[in-house]
Amino acid sequence: IIFSMDYPLWLPFKNEWWTFFVILASILIIVMASELILKLRMLSPESNRRVVHIFIGTFVTLSPIVFTSYLPPATLAFIFIILNYFAYSNKRFKGIHSQSRITYGTIYFPIGYFIITVCFWQYTELLIISLSILTIADPIASYVGENTSNNNEFTIWEDKKTIEGTAAFFITSTVIVF
């Protein structure tokens, strides 16, 4: 049985820009909290980054549920493309960046989010599925890959991956899609 839902499912405020500012503030609070968690060494840098990834990814994944227009989410993405670029360039917000390797995920994620919201906003279910995969499968693959032997490593461009991490990404993605 195929069915379609009407989006958004919930409008927290009459004006969408209030929702935008609440989400923006929430994301900034999460980033600041991650800095504190990193300084207090409550989590390892990679675990801290994964937790931030999941929380912020969940916020943006839910954007079609709380916004009628792609404009507020696209604006949010644009703001974080700029903020993440400057934070990365100036070695700020280490709680959201990988500590052990050079990665650009914190810059690529909002770029991908921007493209998806602008180009595919009318395909809400696909947007939610694709963002869910990025939000959930990526940190699971990272965790599995880091906690397995290095005997099964391979390199894509300059990134080292493991067969186990790749399998975890595939399995998680399959579960999300179906």
Per-region residue spans from a language model:
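Interhelical loop and helix-boundary elements at the membrane-water interface
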Residues: 4-22, 32-72, 84-177
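Glycine-rich nucleotide/cofactor/substrate-binding loop typically near the N-terminus or early
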Residues: 77-83
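Glycine/aspartate-rich loop-and-adjacent alpha/beta segment that forms the canonical ThDP
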Residues: 26-30
